Amino acid sequence: MTNKEFSDGFSTLLNSFGITPNITLDEYEKSTFLTNAQEQLIIDIYSGRNIIYGKSFEQTEEIRRYLSNLVETYETSTKVTGKLGLSKDSVFFEIPQDTWFITYEVAFLKDSRLGCLDGIEASVVPLPQDDLYRAKDNPFRGPSKDRVLRLDIKSDLAELISKYNVDKYLMRYISQPTPIILVDLPDGLSINGVSTESECELNPVVHRAILERAVQLAIISKTQLTGNKE
């Protein structure tokens, strides 16, 4: 849908509920509800909690296509220094600030102790911080030539724990979507830091679901404020 189609569809669908008194929204309010609906739908699709789609992001090609426009790849060999890790083998890398969900990640190990395996790719395994003590010395769960552990400490920083030197970190991730902003917003107004018009970047097949959820959010919000029900 174009932004005009989103706006017109929002008004039409909202009016079809026959709510009294009628709910009237400006373009900023519509944009806010559409953006919130988009973000909720992405989380539901990724996790598999959405009852319409039923499966999570990695389970079917169809579901992966719904979010394919948000998939980004990031690679870095620049380590962040001056950070105190939970292990003597900790190393830190910055990750993009728009990272929502990491879907694939590997570390490239470059260490003379690896011999002919120098330069090998190791899977990066996310680990809750309270599991680190139990996992770090476990041969099946701890760091090895095939496995590097990752702890998340900030939204833009990853702590990797490896027995060997990590030369490079590669990840593929679902990025935070740009907000759906129907028109350029007046001075002082923004959504997720953006104030200029921007269209939905998701696969068009989910646009209708975003619109319907946005209208539901608007009805819930407005009826709670006025005390009216459908």
From Swiss-Prot:
GO cellular component terms, semicolon-separated: virion component
Keyword vocabulary terms for this entry: Virion
UniProt KW Ribosomal protein keyword: no
Keyword Ligase found: no
Main subcellular location of this protein, as a coarse class: virion
Compartments, as annotated in UniProt: Virion
Primary role: Forms the tail multi-ring barrel with ring protein 1, ring protein 2 and ring protein 4.
Subunit structure: Homododecamer.
Misc: The barrel is composed of five stacked dodecameric ring structures. Podoviridae-like phages usually possess only one such ring. The tail is thus rather long.
Protein name: Ring protein 3
Organism, scientific name: Bacteroides phage crAss001
